[in-house]
Amino acid sequence: MKFISWNVNGLRACVQKGFLDFFNSIDADFFCIQESKLQAGQIDLDLPGYHQYWNYAEKKGYSGTAIFAKNEPLSVSYGIGIEEHDREGRVITLEYDNFYLVTCYTPNSQNELKRLPYRMQWEDDFREYLKALDAKKPVVLCGDLNVAHNEIDLKNPKTNRKNAGFSDEERAKMTELLGSGFTDTFRYFYPDAEGIYSWWSYRFKAREKNAGWRIDYFITSKRINDKLQKAAIHTDVLGSDHCPVEAVSYTHLRAHET
């Protein structure tokens, strides 16, 4: 099964920049997006063969997530069941026969780490949410997790040590998540790969210079490592300041057939 995740940085804009070309060519079983920046009814996306699940932020033009799935799930949930966290449309969970698919757009800690205390609470609550799912079935988590875990995951680690996305605190929370029984699928296949990123600032010709960050992930329950077949980052795909990331599993992960 093929999973794709992409922070589209505004879906309406991305649709004008080739979103559907990539969507159709990649032919994913599950296609997850973050930062849709939409409210209900603002786009009519024709995706034959896919079920669409949307989570919108209360604030207009902000955040938002969606999952497009070929197979209808057993159940769908929006958010993580904590009102403080669930106003910004950041999480969707689909339940299938023997796994959960979760897409997430993690809150940014913002300039001068102004939102770091909230981010820390989010990290703890979201990790507990994932662990509770994992106690029932394996989890496939994807999305913009807004952290470059290690120095190898961004171009300029030394100058970004105290910036949002590479603070010691955020990195430690990712370490804690992975230590709770989860795998960073890209590093599972490519533990030493350098210069492969998923986000580039629009400033300073960052993408042209490949001055990027790897902050978009597929994180899976460690006990299904043997079912992972592939991880990829589609750095050549334009349309957003992020590029799509991919994971492929052997079909031991079954989607419910309808």
Each model region followed by its residue ranges:
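Conserved small/polar residues in nucleotide/adenosyl-binding loops
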Residues: 251-258
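Active-site-proximal beta-strand elements of phosphoester/diester hydrolases
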Residues: 1-9, 98-110, 142
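Active-site beta-strand/loop signature of hydrolases that rely on acidic residues for catalysis
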Residues: 7, 23-41, 101, 130-151, ...
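Structured beta-strand-rich core segments of catalytic domains in phosphoester-bond hydrolases
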Residues: 37, 42-109
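Conserved beta strand-loop-helix elements of the APE1-like EEP
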Residues: 60-75, 204-226
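Surface-exposed cleft-lining segments at the edges of enzyme active sites
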Residues: 81-82, 107-123, 160-162
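Internal alpha/beta domain cores that form substrate/cofactor-binding pockets in large enzymes
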Residues: 2-11, 22, 40-52
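Metal-dependent phosphoesterases centered on the DNase I-like endonuclease/exonuclease/phosphatase
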Residues: 51, 125-211, 215
